[in-house]
Amino acid sequence: MEFLTNEKLTIVGAAGMIGSNMVQTALTMRLTNDICLYDVFSPEGVAEEMRQSGFGDVKITATTDAKEAFTNAKYIISSGGAPRKAGMTREDLLKGNCEIAEGLGKNIKEYCPDVKHVVIIFNPADLTGLVTLLYSGLKPSQVTTLAALDSTRLQSALAKKFNVMQSEVKGCATYGGHGEQMAVFGSHVTIDGKPLTEIIGTPEFTNEEWEQMKTDVTKGGAKIIELRGRSSFQSPAYLSVEMIRAVMGGEPFKYPVGTYVSTDKYNHIMMAMNTTLDTTGAHYTVPQGTAEENAKLDASYEHLCKMRDELVTLNIVPEISKWNEINPDRKSTRLNSSHQAISYAVFCLK
């Protein structure tokens, strides 16, 4: 079986649970024959176990040295931040993990400025992704964050409720921030071909049940901690590798991703939009839902802006007016109007 590429993939945080699962997933998918495992704690144990798995003609290296890890890297996935613990929100990780993101961005700029794509998954991902983008000097289309986990949680919940396969639940999406203020969109969802909007408010699925499901989706990460005693690791690992696979030339990624947004309404922020992610990177359109859904998206954006402004106060990023000094190439890649309708129609069929 051929590899998608022979270019170097660096996995940051590879000694941890998410990182080590990303390594195994990437090897199983045969993404590349050149994988580097990087962590501040030696990931050699992970590398040795992967070698002993017998994946064959793959170069697996492990290092704690940033220069070795990032030099010649063309693709990067980073889970290299502190995980969320019981009782914590993603926002509680803001200062420490954004400082880590600053270092990551600077390492990218110094050692692999020609990297093709970077996926950020450590929380709060919208902000750690933004910080990485700013300090890396990369284009917005080259840096994305994991947001799909919220959409798959909605899909999973609906599939369980209506006793259907997840593949029969289409159009699931959450937009805005990857946190409890996310905007859950149900207006484009179909269950086995039937619009969800025709089911909500019936005895089969009451308004109260739908509201509770949306709340449960926004707290899906906390539920995993409750059930397993630790934060999610298998699902974010798999979805993030699927993201990098899409950029390497695999099937386009079918769920929303976090991307840098620059519109008249939403600006100077990273958040989940209706996106395409493929070999050209990330491109987005602004989702259109019901008035209530759009208002939720506005509120999610405002919440992200408050955290972004806190990063300015903490001196992790400069004032917005000075962002061009550290990354002048921040023009976002929004799809033109002729592609927006096509993109959204295709998403609703996913």
Positions of PLM-derived features:
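Conserved N-terminal Rossmann-fold NAD(P) cofactor-binding segment
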Residues: 6, 31-74, 88, 309, ...
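Conserved glycine-rich cofactor-binding loop
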Residues: 15
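N-terminal Rossmann-fold NAD(P) dinucleotide-binding loop
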Residues: 19-20
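Conserved S-adenosyl-L-methionine
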Residues: 28-34, 137-140
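A structured beta-alpha segment of the ubiquitous adenosine-cofactor-binding alpha/beta core
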Residues: 54-75, 81-90, 96-113
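Rossmann-like NAD(P)(H) cofactor-binding subdomain of soluble oxidoreductases
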Residues: 89-157
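C-terminal substrate-binding/catalytic lobe of Rossmann-fold NAD(P)-dependent dehydrogenases
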Residues: 136-141, 151-330, 334
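Single conserved hydrophobic/aromatic residue that forms the stacking wall/gate
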Residues: 329-331, 335-350
